Amino acid sequence: MKDYISSPLSPSNKKMPDNQKISPTNTPIRKKLFENTQSPIHFISNNNNNNITTPAKGLASVIKFNSSNYGNHHHQHHHQHHNNNNNSTVSGSAIKQHLNKSTFSTSGTTLTSSSDAILLPEDKVPMSVYLRIRPLSKKEIESKESNCFTVLNTTSVSIKSSRSDSDSNKFSFSSVLPPNTTQPQLFKTITHPLIQSFLTGHNVLLLAYGVTNAGKTYTVSGSKRNPGIIPRSLDLIFKSIPNNCLKKTENLTLSNNNNNSTNNNSKDSKDILADSSDDEYTKVDNIDSSDEDDSNAKINSNLLESFSTTNTTATTNAAAAASSTTATSNGDVIQISDQFNYSIWISYYEIYKKNIYDLLDDSPSSKKKQSLKIESDNSVVNIKGLKEILVSSVEDARDIVEQGESNRKVGGTKLNATSSRSHAVLTIKLFTSPRHIPKSDIHPSQIRCSKLCIIDLAGSERASRTETTGETFKEGSSINTSLFTLGKCIEGLKQQALQQQQQQQQHSSKRQSIHHSNPIPWRESDLTRICQEYFCGNGKASMIVNVSPSSCDSEETLNVLRFSASAKEITTLSKIKPMVFLPPPPTTPSISLKKRKSMEQPINNNNNNNNNNNNNAYYNITQLQNSVNEIKKKIHLDNLLAVGQLPISNNNNNNNGKFDYISMEKDQLLDQIQIYQKKLSNYEIKFVESEVTLREEFNNELIKNYIELENQYKERLVKESQLIHDRVQSKLSLIKNVNINQTNKLNCKIEKLELQLEQQQQKTMEANNKALVIVPQTNKRTDDEWIIEITEVQTERDNIQNKLNSILFELDEQRQHNQFSLERIQQFTLQTEQLEIERENLLTEIESMQSKGQELIKLRELEMMQLKESMNSDAQKDRENLEIQHNFETSNLNNQLQMERQEKLQIIEEMRMLKLELQQFKSNQSIEQQRNNNLIKNQYYNHNHPTAATAMTTTTPPIMSTPPIMSTPIKISSVGKFKATPSKSLIKNILGAHSNSPFKNANIESSVGGGFKVQLNIPGSPIQLAPGTPNSIQSQTPDRPILDPNQYSDSGLLMQEIDDDDYLNITGGGSANDGNWTDINVNDDSASEYDDLNSSSKSFTKKPKKTKSFGTIKRIKAVAMIPANIASSALNSSTTNIDEKEKLEKLEKLEKEKERLEKERLEKEKEKERLEKEREKEKERLEKERERLEKEKEKERERLEKEREKEKESKPKVVKKTTSSSSIISKKPSSKTTSSLTNNNNNNNNNNNNNNNNNNNNNNNNNNKSISPIKTVQSPNSPSPTKLQPHSSPNTNAKEYFNLMNPQVIIHFREPETNFVPSVTANTTTSTSTSTSKSSKKTLDSLKDTPKKIANIFSSKSSKEKEASTSSKSSSKISSSTSTTSTAPKLKRFAAITASHSIENGSESSPIEVDTPPRITKKPPVPIVSKVSSKKVSSSSSSTSSSSSSAATIKRVRKIVNEKKNYLEDDDDDVITKMATETPRKTLGLRPRNLISQPIQFR
């Protein structure tokens, strides 16, 4: 049955606006028919919902508009209008078909119909376009390619092109699939709805489009792990089709070789039915859409026959089967009806270089494959010779697809190693036929064919980027050409849609215009010819646009997106071919076949008459009414027959009066059936009547519309004919004008020829006249001759006319040639314009590439800057971490140092105690032995003023019965950084060593600072001392300093290795080099002696000693200048009672400790470098502190001076004449003198204390504590002094000498003031008695600060060359301020304390004169101490220069040092003195005076 042609399409191929479409709900009787319904009837359904439950839905669906378009040329309009009118009739059989397929509910109030059994309305489906963005590849990530896409939402994106940085490039799609979309998600979003439409009967086209290397093949085919669209589609199709309904045969192949086929679907159905060996299919004739009218006639007759039956059950089942064909998705599987048989056919081919090749061709590879040709008719494409294989399982289908993919053309380019070089087309056909109809009754119209076409398009590419040449370049050019043609076709469809919209607007505004759209170039490419069926015919089209997110592909991607934007705006028409159901014949025939034919014959005749009548466009209402009457009669007869066949129950007699309940129930059921049949018949009659009235009104309106359209068309034809007439007239006028011009020219030529002819005739006449005159006139010409001549002239004229015609013809040809050349010129100009556009595009691309290069350079620079900054920040962080780690390590090291220092202090204390015990024992033995030896001597004191006592020599008074005494300094042990001061027991042993010692009962008191105060009372003596001689001696030991670990030199933990001499000194065995004294020249002030001193100290420090020790035990040598036999005997006897084994064990432990500390030394040396920088800062702070302390000391000093002056004033003045200094000096050292050994270590201590960052002003003095030398002053109340003869024996001891003194002597061991550098001033004694008071006053003044000026008795060598160099530099600065200072000789201690007592008979005591020579000193290394010392030196030098005797005294002392070498030397270093360089030794010369009976105070 042919569909009706509706009015939305005008003869000029214009579409009517929506408000002019005819719908049953727009008629005047709408309210009358549908006032009880909830929703109006929609004439055209815009969706796929086919379950509309409205009473007139089935009726509306029968009236269906055809979408066939009119021709594009005006000369086809009339003919097509004629054909449309022929088809504008409604067949009465269609009504009966609809009535036959309608079902009613049992309640009689609700009507339902199945629209699938009827022709479905056409659906205008917009083309779905999906965008899939592939992720960046590894190479793109390594090359740092950026993503040019920005996903705005699920349906729109924006792209940033390399040419333009603007974000205006925004595109919208049906759906946007981001890079993280999986294959199942893509299939569910895109392909699943398409498969559902395919199973319901729609034709579906799916395109995969994009540039090369964008992921098209992966999307379509996928991989083994992630299959693509094709494998998943096959799985879904075979899962959805019931197994019992699937055609199962061996693989059956079809070859399309029918050249005369006009419909692919009909041919396929014929081939299927012909080639099938199953009983389900039968052979049928060829079916074509043009033959549908004939087939519909046959079907209508069958419908009328079936309509007469009363078997409503069969019709209900058929309708239910039809309704079940609608596929419903239940999860992944689509449920379809099992009332049909299904068969699936697959074909796979490719389009390579404008040729089609079958991918399923099994021909040998050696043979060249033959290309296939396309044949098309009525917009249906057929490929001749293409294989189509019947498949019955998923495995078979997959094998076929894999075979085709293996035969596909694949090549490698720069951008893609496996680039597809052809368009692959996979076609899946699904044939559907009803199962309940026997094979003999199957009609081809009952077979439905739906197609699923999946096309994997080859990627568009640029040869400049892919770098293809040769055959690959040709492949790329053919791919680009076919894609360009597809783009033009889609753009043409878009323009047609826009024009149709404009025409609709013009119709609504009642404006008329003629638009001639350009034809769409479908035939320019095989790809577009294949796709034409789906775009322009019946089908749904979808497109998957695959794009690359790389910024380098942004230009090609932008073109693809523009193409997809055009494709999104087009729409396709999709309709489902209805399934015609033929129910089985009725079981109870009510009307004979002849009567049904006679009933049907008027209707068919009416249809034929309407088809032959070209001017009738409306229904024949009378025929419809007749058909209604026929239906009423039929229904009435059926009801009568049904009633007559009802069984009547007469079982009462047979059952003996019992009720036959079964028969009664049957009667009730029959009554209900009759009631329902009446209702049904009434309802059908009403429905038909309403349908007839509806059709009548609809046809009236339709006729009006057709009349209007016909009038409009006639007007247009008139206008067009007028235009054509005008054009013909204009052409004719042009031809006439040309002919007139040509005839005018010819007339001009003829006139000229006639003139020439006349002239010639005149000449001939003249010549004849002359001849007549001369010659007798001949015979005249006859008429025939004249006629002949005229005819000749006419022939010439005709020849000329022919020439003119030929010239005109040539002119026409020339015009045509010129017109053709103009067209060629226009073409060439277009080509040149295109080339110019391409050149401009290339230039813009070059500029964009240059800009990209600059941007890349800038990006690289920025990256380098960022990298540098990050590296700098990392380096800074590493430095900070290293500093933190370093600080942490140093803190740990400091903690270790503190712990080690504590251990060292314990060891030092043990060594100190051992040394003290050794010294006590040794000193007691040596002193006692010396005393016993001195008792033997008979020579005593011999006071002789001109002779001076040399250092460490004994003086013997001339008259003395007591044993002699030698004046030796009291020994002090130095352990580590501490000086061990004598204990009480030691002092008592020293003072009371002799049995006759007068000092046994000495008073010993402890001072506050830790020292001792000893007061010796000299008993009365028969010897009368000179007036002014002191009768008491008082001195004080240095206080014990407090431990300060920062005073250690060399980071506080270094100690020298103990050598053999040190070991002997510790054990008390002495040294082998004790008697080897070095001669020095005191008068030489050059630096050579100092260099010798430094070299000796260096040689000492350069010994192979491991300098990791808690402190070096210094052996202190204070040996008096006594004979060798006495000294050796004393030293040998001192080691007899000492346990050497215990000491050796302790020394072994010390050796092990040294080895452990050696490893730590290197680490601490590194730490020392860092601490040196901090020391410099600490020095500045110490300078300010020292200045403050100096001021305080000066104030304290002034206060003490005032107190001393008061004391001196309170004492009586002593007037004693003394001899001049010249008389005191003698060449032979016969007189006994007292000298003191001063050892100044303040400079070294100050230097090391500054380096150790400690404020060691007080500690320096504590470390430099020494026993103040004994000084003798003359008592003011003593009588006139008498000269004492000096000792003549060199073996007398100073201890015994003091024991022989009768007067009371008080000795104070006092702590020196801090930071005071002692300086010794030379004092001279007066020779006259009148100047005794002045001399004594000067002596007291010079001796006021003697404890501060005298250096420590014990000193050590410098252990470092660096300290010696710093002291030498500092000494050069102080040399300018004092003239008496000079480089120190190579000595460590020098003390000369001699006291000569001249005891006269009858006198108390003889006076003692003290002469102190100037000191020899060095500048200390610390600048602050140097300033202090320089002040003291300058004061001392000024005092020295005041007397003339000081120079003589200095010479005398130097001579004594050179001759006698009476000085003490220590070969070992002291840890305390390591902090400073070796300081000069001070010498003090004492001139004896007559002792007096009164006590003498020494401070």
Curated annotation (Swiss-Prot):
Per UniProt, the ranges with Basic residues bias are: 72-82
UniProt keyword Endoplasmic reticulum present = no
Which stretches are tagged as biased composition: Low complexity? 252-266, 497-506, 1217-1265, 1324-1334, 1365-1383, 1425-1446
UniProt keyword list: ATP-binding, Cell cycle, Cell division, Coiled coil, Cytoplasm, Cytoskeleton, Microtubule, Mitosis, Motor protein, Nucleotide-binding, Nucleus, Protein transport, Transport
Q: Where does ATP bind?
A: 210-217
Map out region (Disordered) in residue numbers: 1-27, 68-92, 252-273, 497-521, 1021-1049, 1088-1107, 1161-1295, 1318-1383, 1395-1451
The principal location of this protein is: cytoplasm
Origin superkingdom: Eukaryota
Q: Where is the composition biased (Polar residues)?
A: 1029-1038, 1266-1294, 1395-1406
SUPFAM superfamilies in UniProt: P-loop containing nucleoside triphosphate hydrolases
Residue ranges under compositional bias (Basic and acidic residues)? 1161-1212, 1338-1348
Q: Name one GO molecular function term.
A: microtubule binding
Query: In this protein, which residues make up the domain named Kinesin motor?
Result: 126-570
Where does it localize?
A: Cytoplasm, Cytoskeleton; Nucleus; Cytoplasm, Cytoskeleton, Spindle; Cytoplasm, Cytoskeleton, Microtubule organizing center, Centrosome
List where this protein forms a coiled coil: 739-923, 1134-1257
**Any single Gene Ontology cellular-component annotation:** spindle
Q: Name one GO biological process term.
A: nuclear division
What does the UniProt record say this protein does? Answer: Microtubule-associated force-producing protein that plays a role in organelle transport. Its motor activity is directed toward the microtubule's plus end. Required for cytokinesis. May be involved in a vesicle-mediated transport of myosin II, the Aurora kinase (aurK) and other proteins along mitotic extracellular microtubules toward the center of the cell and the cleavage furrow in order to ensure cell division coupled to mitosis.
* Family per record: Belongs to the TRAFAC class myosin-kinesin ATPase superfamily. Kinesin family.
Q: What is this protein called?
A: Kinesin-related protein 12
Organism per entry = Dictyostelium discoideum (Social amoeba)
Q: What is the lineage of its organism?
A: Eukaryota, Amoebozoa, Evosea, Eumycetozoa, Dictyostelia
